Swiss-Prot record:
Pathway: Isoprenoid biosynthesis; dimethylallyl diphosphate biosynthesis; dimethylallyl diphosphate from (2E)-4-hydroxy-3-methylbutenyl diphosphate: step 1/1; Isoprenoid biosynthesis; isopentenyl diphosphate biosynthesis via DXP pathway; isopentenyl diphosphate from 1-deoxy-D-xylulose 5-phosphate: step 6/6. It comes from the Bacteria. This is 4-hydroxy-3-methylbut-2-enyl diphosphate reductase. Belongs to the IspH family. It comes from Azobacteroides pseudotrichonymphae genomovar. CFP2.
Length: 287
């Protein structure tokens, strides 16, 4: 192996970086800070922050604490969570990503404009993802969530359709869903689609395709529960079949590097830079 390169564009997106910085800032002056859910979908980064004093809680536990500081992560929260926090005199440190927050407001505004009209909000995203749960909450739980074009039978085509996307989905999949719905729409039903996929995500997909073909072997670093990690890894794999998904250096197998001259290391928007650097150092014995 001659070269090891870490993708300069991989690592935390703006929203995740901001949430982590806010947590670290609070932990400098406070011994105790709660976070509602994992602050990022990467277990190594969560453990690092837990060692500094961050305490991860779930929604049930939020209902049982009072007068505490709680960080709401970049994925956002539904209105019901804010109600519980306010009732319990929780000091909220709101680290909702600005892109997600703007999307929440847009969905809520359109939903509230429905009044008695026959209309529906449809969300393209992972049904169990925290961001999607928060978005559905903007519609009092009435939004329809579809994970692929195969799910569009859940849509009521007798009602107007307003389609949005989770910010970390694959734009080509969103476009396919738009086409499928357009083919089924019958006048006078209204169909409006809003491509709400984050531009950072789109740019990373384009960049990672180029990065992948520059190396003999790719190590893609991501947590098992990273939604954008799955998408970005699949794009890497399409561009370079010699791509391996790892969560840390323990997943690496020495036989991967036989005859390999160039290794690229990249990751999800939830993958810390320090972890990719640690993995790069672990490859030195294979030189």
């Amino acid at each position: 192996m001659k070269t090891i390169e870490i993708d300069c564009d991989s690592g935390f997106c703006f929203g995740v970086m901001s949430a982590i910085q806010r947590a670290e800032k609070e932990l400098i002056t406070n011994d105790e800070l709660y976070c509602l859910g994992d602050i990022v979908h990467n277990s190594q980064e969560v453990v690092r922050l837990q060692k500094k004093g961050l305490k991860i809680i779930n929604h049930e536990e939020l209902g049982r604490i009072y007068n505490k500081k709680v960080l709401f992560r970049a994925h956002g929260e539904p209105p019901s969570t804010y109600e519980v926090a306010n009732q319990n005199s929780i000091h909220i440190i709101d680290a909702t990503c600005p892109v997600v927050l703007q999307l929440q407001k847009k969905i809520q505004k359109i939903y509230q404009s429905f009044a008695n009209t026959k209309s529906q909000i449809v969300l393209f995203g992972r049904s169990k993802h925290a961001e999607v749960s928060a978005l559905v909450g903007q519609t009092n739980g009435n939004a329809i969530v579809i994970e692929s074009k195969n799910d569009i039978q859940q849509i009521d085509f007798a009602k107007n359709i307003y389609l949005f996307s989770q910010t970390t989905m694959f734009v080509d999949d969103f476009k396919e869903i738009v086409k499928e719905i357009e083919n089924k729409i019958i006048h006078p039903i209204i169909f409006s689609s809003f491509n709400t996929i984050c531009h950072q995500m789109v740019n990373r997909i384009n960049h990672i395709r180029k990065f992948a073909v520059q190396h003999n072997l790719l190590l893609f670093v991501a947590g098992d529960n990273s939604s954008n990690g799955t998408i970005l890894f699949n794009e890497c794999r399409r561009a370079n079949l010699n791509t391996y998904l790892i969560s840390d250096e323990k997943d690496i197998q020495s036989e991967w590097f036989n005859g390999i001259k160039s290794v690229g290391i990249c990751g999800a928007t939830s993958t810390p830079k320090w972890l990719m650097e640690k993995i790069a150092l672990s490859l030195i014995p294979f030189h």
